[in-house]
């Protein structure tokens, strides 16, 4: 039946429908559809009518009532018409049944138009079931309705489905674009409502009013499918339909959510633009409303800056808030928070005024007189109605920022004022004076402030309790008044210079006076109506006059803007001068303490808190008047700005109030902070704080971890303390829900002690605000203290404890008492307190000798808990002590470099402050206390072990007996010490970047030794001893010797041996006489040397010179013949020349003394382990650098050195942005695109060559059948994720040929189109070097092959499509790939599997296990690198047979057959190889470097002398503050990537001598400072100068047919940042260097021996793998050797005594190493340090040493 109907109407197509029943489309700017169905109003007010006259035909319906919606009502059917819109056809309910789906197979094939299935339709009567329909259904969104004259009728609310049915319903328009979907879905929802389906539309909460029926779901699906074609749906809609194609309800719900969000944004913008506030509601509520709106808009991407927000807020202010519009118009940098401060101040003033309800006087003679007067009040508070702020945020003082100038100020003068003056003088604008309005006032010439808002007038202020004036000319009987406190509306202090009388002479010749305060720090002269009322003068604002109570008019009032003014002409001038007034305040004879000093003394607390504390005697010893508060208002502490920087203020009222009913110490708040990273193990990483709810008393305890037992110990301690000290019991402890508080152990403890745990709600920071705010405050103080003092970060908890002590003693502004007072304790005696980090000298009661200094420099931390002493940090001892034997070091405070503190000196203040305390100590001290060794009560910092940062100041170097560098002083008397700038050390933040160093031109360290004959005046003599710069500080077994070189600057000998010193000159700083030290024997010299840090390992002395190889023989490692000697015999070790005796150079005296940093160095330097061994340490002279390259350096000026120290490391401020930015840096592009090479190439010849290469590539692609040429696919038919973009790339090869390559964009390939588990293998570089070395020793032929278009031989399994090449001109078509095109993720793996299978099955090869791409059979070895093959064999015919088989399958080219007996040159994987069979092989990259380096734009210096080494020891990379523009930063990082990338490529290929420098600089790629770039340039310069160097191999001639594989290992202990060690290994095969490695140890070693063990253990796995490869390729016996210069390591390896190192940190690794040596039959041998060529891998060396260790194997 249905098919018959369709055949009768063939023009009706599936999926199309039409209707003449339409509703008028309303076009409006407003949203035509509200957000939810529950709130939707009818979009159309009534149903539309037909264009022609309508007639209705009643119809009977037997359709049963639908329980989910209203019963269908009879509808009027329009009669036939001649218009373009045919008559609507109705259908029966049976026809609406979706049973037709089974016939057509899918809902999309249903023959019914969707709106015909709406439940509102029913059979109208007998008529044709399928009348003529239009060709389309609906109209596009952009098409207006074709109907006219539509009428509307009211419809009921959409909240209920029991509504009357509309007679005619217009279908929704067709969706024509994904961008129109939001508008379309609104009309679609309206269509559903009109179809009586409003109840199924999701509401705001995403749920419909009622459940949808199956028929309604069918109707919903079909209408959506027809009117919203799938190609025009947004992506998020397609994603929903891809899961369930019938889930239209979810689409509607999501759409409503999006519309709700858009509506919220629009509502917020409208609300913000129409703000109104007059003080009728609380200011807090108004602020919360505005800030919430701004935050929502910002979160939704609509940024509202402070300027716009302030303008919108001020525009809506009215009433008493209106004046903020005018007083803020010059404040360009005002923030919303600052504006609300003013609003809060005015609101609080209003509330105070309402509570006090001031009385207004009435004039008895005139009831209409509205004279207002306030009774005078004695409170010294001035609420300025015109608060002003400065243009910047330096000061919050209400200063005089005037708003008008003298050019437009009124100048008319009229002294006569009649009583009949009733009209107010209105001046709405200062220019109104020129519009005929006369101002009946005159100005006083000498008091005219021309930039006032109304010059020559006083501002009448009803809110001010005192009169303030800026000019001193009107003040009578002036006197100082330091005790008066005046604040403005924002509670900011206003400094007062003087107090006096202000005398008036009014027009009725009456005179009167009031009190006046003089201050220049106000915006306007304020006349208090309260004080006028006190002298019977009131202001009548109805008549605008000042008058007495009897009605006598005294002066007129001028209204200008929103304020009222009175002329200054009625003031009587005084004869006092301005300087007299200004100097009144400073005439006191007693000098006061400066506020900056007190601010720092009291832990950087704010001025208001300090004043409260002094006023309430919570701080004793001096009073509030003893402090100079004049600078407190505008003082800006830079350390506070840095340390206490916050995002915004804490929200008021966030604290809960329910704890107020508890007694002191019954309710505690607690919280844990941490961890703090990159600290020594002895320093705490956490702290736990406690705060009492009632007294606000605070406790802090350090923690090393957050384990249950650690937390339990702290709880036990504080509960016992409160119980014993305060006789109180804790009832409740409030804490968060961290696991450290919710564990069962603590819960049982609290339950046992009867304590209720009160846990806060998860993520509710407000409920836990007390503890969290305390932690934040303490951390702010901590950062500020560390910033101000410069102490290292591991003392962070000392700063926390200092802050806790002080803050427990400061009064709270609310309670007016301190926590100590609430707890019943006495106030803090400030005379016992020292500023945090104050330099002091601590008495050493037990020095090492009688001639050593008695004082040790230190830094005061905080008062001791356990004694009357002070906790002092001693950097030289790396510990803190509790002592009273200290002296405050006087001198200027030297703080941060960026702030100038030199103008501040508090020595005299500090002496005055502590005088009484020290006199008390002196008078009561019976005997000298020897408490230096009393450890601090803080065990966590009693011994600071392995601390990477040390204080760097000359004083500590001069007097510390344990410092690594003997003192270097230049003092003439003791006064020189007091003037030295002493500052605690700065450390490099480990979160910024690794602090590393690289070789460069720097002065060598010149250590000094104090003379025995030091003078008693405090001066010290220095012993000038010529010492060479250290070559290594890592190994304690490396001996240290004094120099014996005759010429210190140009000595060619390797001067490291022991020697006797004769006639060592001594220069005294106190005179010019030179003294000599008698000839000292070697033994006597050693007696003076004190080794402070002996090695952790064995007792075998390694400080003696070892001139010969000392083999360690064991039964396991040595056969009968001397295996060690045979292993070392043919290695390329240096030949040490004889060393002539050393004479001292006179130039040595001129070298300036420099103190070595006490941190570790990756390039040498003096560390703690070298303490007092400087005479026999390895040094080198300053002139021992042969380089003359002119590269700028970030060196410090010797004349301007502060404490003779290197510049402090500075933190990078843009690290996070820098790391993000570098991710976006693209690698350098060396190829050309199609348009660059062909389309727009102006070089005709080059263009022709590229065209030729292009056609050659296309022909090769077609030849290889790369894609399916039989069929082209339409782009719309293919899944987009299977379409791979492709492109042609062009480049010019090194041999001059032009090459084109058609590649796929694998970088944007979808992950579903390849198997991520497949690997693309290539030959390892060690395998290639091993094969080349064996080829030289076995006279192998080497043949080089290339397979053209190798990837195209591999089939592709996945279904992938690409765009055709450009010349085909089919941009809208796709072709399917059949081969692995270059660039695809899987192409490399596919080719590897293809060629591997062919070599194994067809060529009879097998792959060496563990070494991918290395194939071998009994005759040939093949190394495969993508499409390059290198063949090795004794018989050239064997290679030819393999080549013949390869040519059968692949297009194989013979690059070099290698058949000549003469020298043959190869270019194998970037290496330029010269090979003569049976003689030698040379590996280099001269041609490649000659071509590439000049293209790097490096400032090369070809004319200067060549560099002798890639760097030199002794230079630190300073982490300076890196402030670069983003583009400049990206450019420099890009440059570093290119330079280090090239250096790495060269280094890992064959220049193993450069690996240390490359590895170090690679760590600073993201920190391209000028110093780092200069060092990189120097490295590239060295590579350029030595580009002709080659790795030299000679054929070995062993006595027996064996292969010898040796690894030489070395380690530099603790020379990397944070005491990491640098390890290095060099691998040799038959005496030929085949590889090297230099890297930073992954773990921190605790001794030299552990570092050496770590280096050896890192080399063993590769050694074993290479051994297996060699045995597979060459069937000869193999001997494996392991060489090290650490005898202690060897003794551990060969020893059978496990107790020797069982309890040491490296015991496990040592045991494993012993097993590996034994199990792999490794021969462990000792090599002399001076012959250890692996030394170049671990540290920078002097030029001569570097050449000596490398000239045997690379030259």
Curated annotation (Swiss-Prot):
Its EC number is 3.4.23.-, 2.7.7.49, 2.7.7.7, 3.1.26.4. Mg(2+) 3 binds at residues 1610, 1652, 1685. GO terms for biological process: DNA integration; DNA recombination; proteolysis; transposition; viral translational frameshifting. Residues 299-401 are annotated as: RNA-binding. One of its GO terms (molecular function) is DNA-directed DNA polymerase activity. Pfam families: rve, RVT_2, TYA. Residues 1-93, 126-173, 352-421, 956-1172 are annotated as: Disordered. The C-terminal RNA-binding region of CA is sufficient for all its nucleocapsid-like chaperone activities. This is Transposon Ty1-GR3 Gag-Pol polyprotein. The lineage of its organism: Eukaryota, Fungi, Dikarya, Ascomycota, Saccharomycotina. The gene is TY1B-GR3.
